[in-house]
């Protein structure tokens, strides 16, 4: 095998590799790599593929539990729901592609996460997403959100999987570097969970799906670098998706898996053929030989380098039982898909690539997909000095609250808090006819669990799966450990608000560069916070995604990092979907109560204004230390919620998060068009904290009037703090008595602020 001369320094820069990487590659190969091999190492040793900066931190996550069937390391995690149901789920990012090509970047992010699900043998049943953008006063950010939402809608709607939930937030730190995290859920249709490790020496390797072109070249390396004004030149690194072809791929794959002839399966996502071959080989402890002359190509004259690094979408690689390949390929062709035998499983644990009858690359599989480099970082022994200084901030530094009425309206108009109907109405939320509760109606989405291809019983149709995505990014920016704990706690609380038992999480760690002391400390502390919270709330981690180098180089050469954003996707089990409650009040006369820290607890460190929406509104300064997460209180509140919902005692439940208690209560009135009269105890000087403080494991509930005796009995058996707030009425006024203050708003004004906040800034139509 020849090693043609090339400019090593330029090639290393193109592949995102360091001089030390070159030395290590040469040591492992015992020779200099050729250009195709260097490209393979470039994508497989990128942060996107091998987590070279984060892998040691991820090992601290709890990954085992009684319901965990598949944990980290496979295409998706799988949990046992009982009664024959098994749920596959995962979250992944497509941040950098969406920054330079928002429509295709977001669309192919959806396609990629769906492939992770059905590659396991699961039929996709729902999609969610977590999105972050810069301020909408900048037309660039308006264009980004329009393109991203349209791309998500296009792919999800066309492939026929409902987008049922998610979150959207805005902050200057995301200007130029939006975050697009896509999560998918699927129900297993096969007896055996399909794994990705190659088995059976001599078994054929079969390529299925779309043809291979030059689109998406170097996408994994691109996703592991900072963004700059020159990043628009990287548009060829963004893939182009075809949701209609993916729909056929879903059906064909599930059909093929059910026949038992597929030994292993791997989708071709980041790093394309290179990643799928090397991962299958490394996980199976064997090797794979790949003949590029047999790979279906859509362009002529493609080099080995281009074949190996192409990230053309809707492609899969299978290891098939010898002798069954032709029948299997005929099945795929009936679905209009390309299918070809492109290689075989080898005894030697290496990836051998043939092109034009010659060996174009030969690399040990583990060098690409298992024994990859780990960056060594020194962890700061104390918080960075700038954060310690910010923690000195006191709530007394905020200006006095003179006009709470206008403040609430302004908060409801904030794009992060305002209604996201402009986003949600572009998604088909009801396709498949299993959506029980979707975006905006409750604190978590709920999907009915129907039997899938003989899996599950007819009695299971009363059961459902709930899902949510959460991250208080401002809290994480101020205290990564507390902020990450809060992300897990809020996700579990949101599931409990619909009556679901939290089961497990998938995480998407969106962070700036880990190469600075502060950057690595933020990542390490957030991982610690997630691990602590998952252990405390019994929600193991089944896998996820790490996206680093989320920062933009300004024109003056300085870097603008995003706020650290560890998005937590959590799933839960609903035993009776008939008992699920939404966030809106249901009927006049129902009592309104608050679970969690009481409104008048002025000195409680579980509640605060640091990192709050109110702080940003009135001061524009992000400072202080966010509230402490009380896991014992969280467990108590969530258990009481689930018990009350299961008993049919509650009419509504809505957690207090962005904007604090006043915003949560207002949102319940807006959702129901019902008025409410509330009394919040508190001193006049503590009015700001009473209305707008965040944290405290708090949930506003309404108890059915006819169920009040049963509720009182249940509450008496609990140690959870419960505060009586008021009563729902059929009026058109939202009124709060707080100490000597008596403040009221018309529901029409609240609705107008909440519903017009986002479309007014984008230029779309407001809700009717």
Curated annotation (Swiss-Prot):
Q: Where in the cell is it found?
A: Cytoplasm
Q: Which stretches are transmembrane? A: none
Q: Name one GO cellular component term.
A: cytoplasm
What Gene Ontology terms describe what this protein does at the molecular function level?
ATP binding; magnesium ion binding; phosphoribosylformylglycinamidine synthase activity
- Which residues hold Mg(2+) 2? 116, 267
What pathway does the UniProt record associate with this protein? Purine metabolism; IMP biosynthesis via de novo pathway; 5-amino-1-(5-phospho-D-ribosyl)imidazole from N(2)-formyl-N(1)-(5-phospho-D-ribosyl)glycinamide: step 1/2
Q: Which domain of life is it from?
A: Bacteria
Q: Which Enzyme Commission number(s) are listed?
A: 6.3.5.3
Q: What class of enzyme is it?
A: ligase
Q: What are the positions of the active site?
A: 48, 94
Q: Keywords in UniProt for this one? A: ATP-binding, Cytoplasm, Ligase, Magnesium, Metal-binding, Nucleotide-binding, Purine biosynthesis
The record lists ATP as bound by 51, 90, 507, 544
Which reactions are catalysed by this chain? N(2)-formyl-N(1)-(5-phospho-beta-D-ribosyl)glycinamide + L-glutamine + ATP + H2O = 2-formamido-N(1)-(5-O-phospho-beta-D-ribosyl)acetamidine + L-glutamate + ADP + phosphate + H(+)
For this chain, the family text in UniProt reads: Belongs to the FGAMS family.
Q: Supply the name of the protein.
A: Phosphoribosylformylglycinamidine synthase subunit PurL
Q: Species name for this entry?
A: Parasynechococcus marenigrum (strain WH8102)
